[in-house]
């Protein structure tokens, strides 16, 4: 028995193949969509997943303005932020965030960011996410060898 064939192969930046995935957010629940996108960005579905390497795909979310929230979460859910100064805690509801310029993109990025690791790798993974409020988008085109596909689960 050859013991060398049983060694675990760890992915690195040179061996990772990144694809472009287009996800349509029309009538999808915000949290469930965010979880699927975070899994795609992280690359957890790939057989050569390595926790400390960016082995996920590039994700393009279209129709971000058509995402839905169940119940009365548009007004009841509160996102907190802190300016760093005394009395600087700010509250934002999804309805008020959507009303701002680029609010749909900011809302989806905020949700996905909360589902990624809170470290340097998580910040790099967030750069692989492109969010557009409408169907028409201008994004970096896929490189040679990369494919564009629509996942059946997302």
PLM regions with names:
Residues 104-115:
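Polyanion-binding loop/helix "lid" in catalytic or ligand-binding cores
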Residues 150-154:
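Hydrophobic alpha-helical segments, chiefly the membrane-spanning helices
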